[in-house]
C-alpha cells in the first residue's frame, strides 16, 4: 500500500509547539490584544494579526519551534511497523514552503531516529495532485481541508485530528 504522510501535526508535534509559542507571542509581545477566537486552536484562525505581525512571528519563531518539536507519541514505532509490513511511506508536506530551513530540521530529526521514507514531497501547496500522481491509497493529514480535497480524488484519508480541533 502507498501511504502518504504529513509531517507537522502527524509525525511531529510542531503544531502544538506553534500554538503555545503563538499564545506567548500574542500575550507578551502584542499585549493580548489580537485574539479573534479563543477556542480556535489553529494559529492562522485564532488571531487577528496584521501581515507584519504574522511575518514577525514567522521570522522570530518558526525555526525555533521546528527545532524544539518532538515526535508524536508512538509514531516511530507505527512508521517502522508499516515499513516492515512492506508499505511505501511517502512524505507529502507543506513544510519548507515558508521557511526552507524547516525541511533540513525534519530531515535531521528523521536521520537521527533512523526513519526512512520512500519519497519526499516538500513545500506542497496542495496535496491532492501528488496523491494521485503517487497512487496513494491512504493519506494521513491533520488538515481537514486537505483531507476533503484528497478524498474528492477517491483516495482514502485519515484525519489525524488534534484533540483541540473541532472539525
Protein language model features and the residues they cover:
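Short, basic/glycine-rich phosphate-binding loops at helix/coil junctions
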Residues: 45-62, 87
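Anion (oxyanion) recognition and catalysis
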Residues: 80-83, 111, 151-152
Amino acid at each position: 500500500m502507498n501511504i502518504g504522510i504529513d509531517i507537522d501535526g502527524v509525525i511531529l508535534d510542531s503544531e502544538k509547539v506553534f500554538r503555545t509559542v503563538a499564545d506567548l507571542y500574542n500575550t507578551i509581545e502584542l499585549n493580548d490584544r489580537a485574539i479573534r477566537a479563543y477556542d480556535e486552536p489553529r494559529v492562522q484562525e485564532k488571531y487577528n494579526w496584521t501581515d507584519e505581525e504574522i511575518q514577525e512571528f514567522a521570522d522570530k519563531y518558526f525555526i525555533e519551534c521546528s527545532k524544539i518539536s518532538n515526535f508524536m507519541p508512538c509514531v516511530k514505532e507505527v512508521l517502522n511497523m508499516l515499513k516492515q509490513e512492506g508499505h511505501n511511506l511517502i512524505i507529502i508536506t507543506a513544510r519548507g514552503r515558508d521557511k526552507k530551513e524547516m525541511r533540513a530540521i525534519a530531515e535531521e530529526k528523521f536521520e537521527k531516529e533512523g526513519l526512512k521514507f520512500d519519497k519526499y514531497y516538500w513545500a506542497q501547496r496542495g496535496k491532492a495532485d501528488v496523491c494521485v500522481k503517487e497512487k496513494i491509497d491512504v493519506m494521513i493529514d491533520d488538515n481537514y481541508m486537505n483531507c476533503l480535497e484528497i478524498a474528492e480524488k477517491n483516495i482514502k484519508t485519515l484525519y489525524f485530528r488534534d484533540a483541540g480541533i473541532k472539525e
